[in-house]
Amino acid sequence: MELVLFDISPESPRDLYLPLSTNHRSSSVNGTLEPHGVTFFIIQGLTNLSERKMILFVILLLGYIIILGGNSMIIFVASTDPKLTSPMYFFLYNLSLVDMVYTTTTIPKMLSGFLTDVNTISMPGCFLQMHFFIQLGVTGYAILTVMAYDRYVAICNPLRYTAIMTRSIKLLLIMGAWGFAIFCTLPATSMTWKRPYCGPNVVRNGWCDLSSVRRLVCADTSVDNIVSVSFAILALLTTGVLILTSYVLIGVSMLRMGVAQRLKAFGTCAAHLTVVSISYGSASFVYISYRVGNFSAEDRIIVSVLFSALTPFLNPIIYSLRNKELQESIRRTLSRFRPAAVIALKDVNT
């Protein structure tokens, strides 16, 4: 069995991997690393950016605040406004919740890493971050698939929409999305968790990315790679094919409609179709950028960070701009808080 301890390349000098933990030290006799010595990982992140590091910190912090604020607003209005009773808003509520937790698994830890010289994370914390980052990412795609099915039923079977999309069906679809994500994620992350880590312990990414952590395994990971690729293909192909099928059927149905009905149907799908295009487009861009071009390690991390936060950042903006019902609900919500704020201000002044 081949032991892959570290990767020495022009972009990854060996001194980057010198362990900082006293529990995984090199043997002075034969140069091998002591087994079972890694007790924590060091997130390399963007420590080599110097002056650009603070610029990226501010951008990432502002983006994270907007992600939390925008998605929190959608969750609040979708759960409290009695006029937003359509199943679409129930699914949007869940998508916003997933986006918030998805970004929270990585961005706060990355922000703290900008402010410290060494960004460390415990082994359990690293694998929990890895698992939930991947699982929530797949859950987001699965919910987008459920939303595509919802649009298909609404446009192609409008008279049976309320009979099909009942409360139990909505809950079943959401539970199915979460279950599908767990099924596609747990095998790969659990296999990586059980592998031995003898050192080095530097993760060459902005967070505990699965492939970056697997490079630190001191054992043969060929089976792990096959399992990871298989389930990644299953997750992306299943959701992608189902979304594409839904929109093909919607397109066929729209061809039989009048112009006014066709425009209304397109308006119903526009926000979701935009989000789907951005989600799969950004994922494809990150995949391609890692395999072509002369990208440095820091540039690749920046690309992956920005594009992983892009969809959660744009979701509330897109749905707020393209959905009139949601716009009106946000205005009603803000108008309810405005009189209370004025009364409170008057009380303070008196």
Task: Give the predicted meaning of each segment.
Residues 1-350:
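Transmembrane helical core of 7TM receptor-like proteins
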